[in-house]
Design a protein with these regions (language model features):
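Mobile gating loops/cap/lid regions near enzyme active sites that modulate substrate access
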Residues: 229-319, 326-378, 413, 424
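Bacterial N-terminal signal peptides that target proteins for export
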Residues: 1-9
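Catalytic nucleophile-elbow at a beta strand-turn-alpha helix junction centered on a G-D-S/GDSL motif
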Residues: 30-44
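Bacterial N-terminal signal peptides
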Residues: 8-18
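Sec/Tat signal peptide C-region and signal peptidase I cleavage site
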Residues: 19-24
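Conserved SGNH/GDSL esterase-like catalytic core that processes O-acyl groups on lipids
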Residues: 45-200, 410-477
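A structural motif corresponding to the C-terminal end of an alpha-helix
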Residues: 63-64, 159, 197-217, 320-341
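Histidine-centered active-site loop/cap adjacent to the catalytic His
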Residues: 30, 54-59, 363-415
């Protein structure tokens, strides 16, 4: 009997060892390191209605984890101009004055979400307060670190997280791209420099977890897929079947101060304001006041206007991002972390989109629904899509059972336009919002798609004759 009992106990031990550790993943204490896209930044703004929709925050909410963030009340903290407000569909934007109003400043421990807009990998390893010099020349640092004397990396490690998320540390490339000034080794850090900081991050978090990394790291997307670089085409017309490109001043023949940019040049979205007055436009195409003047080649720090990205610069950026991603893959995997391919996710959105019962979310600027007004960061819908893909990834790789996000909450309003997050969506409201965009035939295909049954609800008045447009809450379009 004793031998039988010993055999049974041994068998239980063997079976327990045979069960993958991922099947017992603990999501009770999630900690995030990263930058703007991981912090819920959107519309050029860091503010509560974006922060509570940050994709890591959505994931933590779905996982039932206590997830504290450095929330900022309206109007939030924006880019140099402030938070973007759509004024008309030209598009024209107003900018709300940046006013930091912290809502969770007295939390007696570090935040779970330590992602800070504008952060570099080197910022996470070096910065304890805002300074005048890179990588710590960021006033948002003090809103998050609160004079603790510790870096975000040190704070994250001190929480002893059960699950680590290392988000998109891509400002090393994005900063150079959005400025339009890509100088290898100056505005674009060498791969070895990036890798050194990233290794410190993953090694430190692995040690904080007892020597085994449990969590996920994210790759950096291809900047050429962002709406910021695709909203404005370099082709402004066609003459006798030949494309007419915008005008620049690089690569022109000797003695020629302005010429058409080569194919493959990217025109950052803010340049649209210059083009409206004629910059970059041949006078033969449109005799605007500034026609025949080139668009700037490099960014202007004083005005915030970026510069054109020429094919050689785009190629260098893509190569460097691929090199960064290779280092992320190697370093994270060596420490036990899984690698979430953010780059493939964004590429899929921009190439084919994502379908939700007849509604396709794409990467098109303003029209697509994935990118916010700033053209770089997602909308609440976009963040929810990222969160759902991340949930699928964690469930598949760690044997978890985190429930999917109810996309209807985001597709028909989101938290900032009428629906309090975390509360059930009223099915009548869902149908009324759906009727604004789709026919009854499309609506009939919805039962079960979003986890709600709409078949028993009456169609809104007037929908039989086609879509009607209700008042859109939270967005004023003049």
């Amino acid at each position: 009997m004793k031998n039988l009992l010993k055999t049974a106990l041994l068998l239980l031990v063997v079976l327990a060892m045979a069960v993958p550790a991922s099947a017992a993943v603990d999501l009770s204490k999630i900690v995030v390191l990263g930058a703007s896209v991981d912090s819920g930044f959107l519309d050029g703004c860091w503010v509560k209605h974006g922060q509570i929709d940050a994709w890591p925050a959505i994931f933590a909410r779905q996982a039932g984890s206590d997830f504290q963030q450095p929330l900022l009340d309206e109007p939030g903290v924006g880019s140099s101009k402030g938070c973007m407000i759509l004024k008309d569909l030209a598009p024209t934007f107003d900018y709300a004055l940046s006013v930091p109003k912290p809502l969770n400043l007295t939390l007696a421990r570090p935040y779970n979400n330590l992602a800070i807009p504008g952060y570099l990998a080197a910022s996470a390893t070096n910065c304890v307060t805002a300074t005048a010099a890179p990588p710590c020349n960021n006033p948002l640092i003090d809103l998050v670190l609160r004079g603790s004397g510790a870096t975000t990396l040190q704070q994250a490690a001190s929480l002893k997280p059960t699950f680590v998320i290392i988000g998109v540390f891509g400002n090393e490339a994005l900063g150079a791209a959005t400025s339009g000034t890509v100088i290898d080794g100056v505005t674009l850090p060498p791969t070895a420099v990036y890798a050194a900081s990233y290794k410190t991050i993953v090694d430190t978090m692995k040690a904080a977890q007892g020597g085994t990394g449990v969590g996920v790291v994210a790759t950096i997307p291809d900047i050429s897929t962002l709406a910021y670089f695709t909203a404005v085409s370099p082709i402004i017309g066609v003459n006798a079947g030949v494309p007419i490109y915008v005008l620049g001043s690089t690569g022109c023949a000797s003695g020629v101060p302005v010429c058409s940019v080569p194919p493959g040049t990217l025109v950052p979205f803010p340049m649209a304001t210059l083009m409206k007055t004629g910059y970059g436009i041949p006078c033969a195409v449109a005799p605007y006041p500034n026609c025949n003047k080139p668009l700037p080649d490099n960014g202007d720090a004083a005005t915030g206007m970026p510069g054109l990205l020429y094919p050689s610069e785009v190629s260098l950026l893509k190569t460097r991002i691929n090199d960064y991603n290779s280092q992320i893959q190697t370093l994270a995997t060596a420490d036990g972390y899984k690698v979430f391919d953010t780059s493939a996710l964004i590429a899929g959105i921009t190439s084919t989109g994502r379908d939700f019962g007849g509604m396709t979310i794409t990467g098109k600027y303003l029209q697509g629904g994935f990118f916010s007004y700033d053209g770089v960061h997602p909308t609440q819908i976009g963040y929810a899509i990222v969160a759902n893909d991340f949930i699928n990834f964690v469930n598949a790789n760690y044997g978890a059972s985190v429930p999917q996000v109810d996309m209807s909450v985001y597709l028909f309003g989101g938290n900032s336009t009428g629906y309090p997050l975390g509360l059930p969506v009223n099915q009548g409201d869902v149908l009324n919002y759906g009727a604004a965009y789709w026919t009854p035939e499309t609506l009939k295909t919805w039962p079960g798609l979003f986890g709600v049954d709409l078949r028993h609800l009456p169609l809104p008045e007037g929908v039989e004759e086609g879509p009607v447009v209700p008042e859109r809450r939270g967005v004023e379009v003049q």
